Amino acid sequence: MKELRLFLRKIDQKVISKGKHYLLTLIILYRYKTNEVLDHYKEQTPQKEEPIGATSPIWVCWWQGEKKMPDIVKVCYSSICRHADNHPVILITEKNFQEYATMPDFIMQRLYKREMTITHFSDLLRMNLLKRHGGIWLDSTILLTKDIDSIINTSLPYYSHHHIPNNCNVVKGKWTGFFLACGKGNILPSFILDAFYNYWKNNNRIVTYLFIDSLFALAYKHIPAVSKMVNNIPVQPMSNLSKCLNQEYDKKAMETFYTLSLIHI
C-alpha cells in the first residue's frame, strides 16, 4: 500500500509539473507576444547552414575573471582548455564581453539597474555570441575528460547534449543550455535572442528562471528547422558530479565516471 501511494504521488508530481510547464509556455507565447517573434522564423529554411567548424571558438564565461574563479571552477576551466583540440578558448568577463558581443542599450540598463541578474544576462550573452560568431558554449562548471571533438561532430550545424532526463521539466533531455554549439548565424540562437529582446523591451523582471529552456521548447515545437537539428543529435550519457561534491575522493568512483560519460556537470 505504501509503495502504491509513493507511485501515485510521483505520477501526481509529473502531471502537475507538466501542467505548470504547459501553462507557462502559453503565457510566454501569447501574453509576452513571443508568437509574433515565432511568426518570423516558422517557415524559415536556411539555404546554407554554417557548420560548427573544427577551429570555432569555445566560449566560457566567468564574470569576475579567471583570477576570481573558485577552485572548482578553475579545475573545470583547466579541463576545457586541456581538451579544446584546435578550438581557441575565449573567457568572457565583465571587462571584455563588449569586444565580442553587442547588446542593446535597454538590455544593459536592465542589467545595471539589477532588474536582470548576471545569470540571466549570460543566457542572452551565449545566444548573442553563438549567433554572431558561432562556436561552442560551455558553462564554466563543466568538467571535460575527453577532447571536445570526440563529443561533437563539428561538421554539423548544431549540437547540444541530448541525454536521458532524470526529471520531467520542459527540456525532456533534448538539449542543455550549458553545452550548446552551432555555426555562425544559426536559426536557433537567432530566434531565442530576438525573443529575449522582445520580452525585455517591455518587462523588468524575468518570467521564469528557466526562461531560456521555455524559449528553446517553443523553437523546437514551432520551427521545423530547429526540431530537425535537435532530432539529428544522438543521445549521449552525462554524469552528475555535483552530487558527489561533499563526498571523499574515491579514485575508482572517478574512473567509473570517466568511462560512463565524456562530460560531467
Please identify what each model-predicted range represents:
Residues 1-122, 140-263:
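Glycosyltransferase-associated regions of secretory-pathway enzymes
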Residues 123-133:
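Small-residue hinge/turn detector
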Residues 135-137:
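Short aromatic/hydrophobic "clamp" motif used to bind/position activated sugar donors
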